[in-house]
Swiss-Prot record:
Keywords noted in UniProt: Cell membrane, Ion channel, Ion transport, Membrane, Metal-binding, Sodium, Transmembrane, Transmembrane helix, Transport
Record's protein name: Fluoride-specific ion channel FluC 2
Cellular compartments annotated: Cell membrane
Main location: membrane
Pfam families, per database record: CRCB (PF02537)
Assigned protein family: Belongs to the fluoride channel Fluc/FEX (TC 1.A.43) family.
Catalysed transformations (reactions): fluoride(in) = fluoride(out)
GO terms assigned for molecular function: fluoride channel activity; metal ion binding
Activity: how regulated: Na(+) is not transported, but it plays an essential structural role and its presence is essential for fluoride channel function.
Length: 117
């Protein structure tokens, strides 16, 4: 039962952090590319890799921080919806392809780097 509560608490914190980062990025950047999603997904991948590489998977730490906070922070569903939005009438195939590839490649590199440091 404690594990479920830790995941819930962490997930709430991660979701609020994502909302704050999204709001800040929308105010700071006037970009056609959704920068906030890139920031949260790549940073989350780096931290998850670090935790995997350093065996920081204590009984309470992993459910709270990785599953909860980082699960609430990172977002595959928002990435998917942003990609669908890029398929609008002003569709730019190169923007769609580059954004898609960069999300997955940089996320993997960040996770790998986090694991190795």
């Amino acid at each position: 039962m404690i594990t479920i509560l830790l995941v819930m608490l962490g997930g709430g914190i991660g979701a609020v952090l994502r909302a704050l980062i999204t709001n800040i990025c929308q105010r700071l950047f006037n970009s056609k590319i959704p920068i906030a999603t890139s920031i949260v997904n790549i940073t989350g991948s780096l931290i998850i890799g670090f935790m995997m590489g350093h065996a920081l998977d204590s009984h309470h730490m992993f459910p709270f921080f990785v599953t909860g906070v980082l699960g609430g922070l990172t977002t595959f569903s928002t990435l998917s919806s942003e990609l669908v939005n890029m398929l609008s009438p002003q569709f730019k195939p190169i923007r769609f392809v580059v954004y898609s590839l960069l999300q997955f490649i940089l996320g993997f590199i960040a996770c790998f780097y986090g694991y190795r440091i």
